Amino acid sequence: MMSGEVMLVILIVIGLIGRSPIIATAASILLVLKLTALERFFPTVERRGLELGLLFLTISVLVPFASEKISWKDVTPLFTTVVGLTALAGGAIATWMNGKGLDLLRSEPHMIVGLVIGSIIGIVFFRGIPVGPLMAAGITAFVLKLWEWFGSR
């Protein structure tokens, strides 16, 4: 079986070759923690890392409100235009799918491995941005449900 260090080095190389600084940096930080005997922080990082990442993502998205680049005048069209209503629906659907993804991960936690590898493939080969393992799980849950509906017919 491949050791954690080797896997992290492989991820660093994949990140560098694929021009994905996020993967390379994340794997590098984990490798440093592992090599400096700070592995005791892994459970905390695993448990709280996603929350912290989402917190910073949300902060970055809300900066235009705080800096007053977006005003109430800009928010009103959300409720009166097709684009605005579609954005609201998209947000609601994404949130619902995240919930389905969480349900899937709770019932089948081993799927996280496929989601991580799929995310790496998406980052490296499709220039994707890894913002949501829950969304990836939600999409997986949706596709599995479609498979269940149409595959059984």
From Swiss-Prot:
Topological relation to the membrane, as annotated: Multi-pass membrane protein
Keyword Transmembrane: yes
One Pfam family from the record: DUF441
GO cellular component: a single term: plasma membrane
InterPro entries: UPF0756_TM (IPR007382)
Family: Belongs to the UPF0756 family.
Alphabetical UniProt keywords: Cell membrane, Membrane, Transmembrane, Transmembrane helix
HAMAP family on file: UPF0756
Coiled coil, from the record: none
Main location: membrane
Protein name (Swiss-Prot/TrEMBL): UPF0756 membrane protein BBR47_23170
Keyword Ion transport: no
Residue ranges of the TM segments: 6-26, 52-72, 77-97, 111-131, 132-152
Subcellular location(s) per record: Cell membrane
